[in-house]
């Protein structure tokens, strides 16, 4: 007969053996992680793929889609990091801002899944819903978990269930407004919710990065969704790693009251329905192209709206761009339009920044999201995967138009003789592209942007600012023989992306808003 001490000893031994067998039964390599609890019915096909195969797929997806920002080892220090604010998440700490679990808990798999699928509005994290399959998304969830020891040692707590959304009655909104003041929310978010409270410029997260306080009146700025249930969840869970604490010390009703107040202040007219990745279609026309963006030709061309991603957090980013594409027997033309209340046409002073827009094309016959996602990275391409870029600049066009007006006003007068003693204007001599407001370039990754030689520049363009909008036309003939130019063939969709620089936001170089790849179909 065992003594009580012997019995306890053998129970512990059997427990350790059983745990070890269970752990080995689920181990698929160094990155294999256990599933999180309470997820029955949360998704389909999560466990259909064997563990080792799933981890291999996750590693492939991460390499092609995530490593540029989050880094090969998940530390948030990818090659794009220097151009981004907020910085990409450091997965090694196992701290995730969006969760349905209580404060301090690890997220559930489905929380990470939702972040990947929906993206984080207002940041450089796009929505990968149309880019990744279900299997790919769940695979990369498991791969990401492998960067942190927390997933090996902790089990996430069960998800918080918010319950039904109560009616946003006037008394609930009034109570929420009072609580907003009592909880001193205005210290960060401001009394008008615009994110300009007295503490807004003094906040840092646990990574010692400055925190950007978003405009809570802008529904596009809610990272985790602007529906009442989304706002309630953020108030309940907080945003781990940031000064945004949870408000669990308030009653459930009080949190719903604050939710009702915040939701009542949303400027819903700012919501723009547009896709991260869509299909664009070029229209075949018989007309000759002109560079005027307001020519009647463009009235006959259908318009598509593409969503833009700010690489640097800002209060009023350009959120979308409108695209029209046309093709005739000799050339291709595009009309781009976006909102911009103030035209920034000059960069002559060091404190001035100009407006600009660019189109980016993947070279060669590459398809989107096939063969292991081997398309170029939409952010300037990557090594061995060159992109062709057309950039229009407002300051260049202003200089050209000013020069034309000056030439007309001074016909018969040799200004070079008067000003430079017969020598050519030295500034003009240093700007070989100044006869057109468009420059054609190539890149194969960050830091490789290279203008094409002057003799190879064959893209024309013109921009017009009118009624708070920029409209820009790009034009190029189809017969380019330059191997670094995009060839517009009809056999498969062309990958095209867009970027906008807003001078009022001090945009320049890598500071801009961009799109993901779009599929352009030619007639």
PLM-predicted stretches and their roles:
Residues 11-19:
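Bacterial N-terminal signal peptides
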Residues 52-71, 168-194, 200-206, 258:
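Sequence/structural segment immediately N-terminal to covalent heme-attachment motifs in c-type
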Residues 466-523:
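Long, compositionally biased interface segments
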Residues 321-324, 459-465:
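Beta-strand-rich interaction surfaces with strong enrichment in secreted/lumenal proteins
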Residues 305-430, 486, 490-510:
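Surface-exposed, glycine/proline- and aromatic-rich loop segments on solvent-exposed faces
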Residues 266-344, 435-441, 446-448, 452, ...:
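Order/disorder boundary and secretion-linked terminal/linker segments
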Residues 29-61, 151-181:
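Electrostatic cytochrome c docking/interface patches
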Residues 82-129, 134-145, 202-250, 255-263, ...:
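Extracytoplasmic electron-transfer domains, predominantly the class I c-type cytochrome c fold
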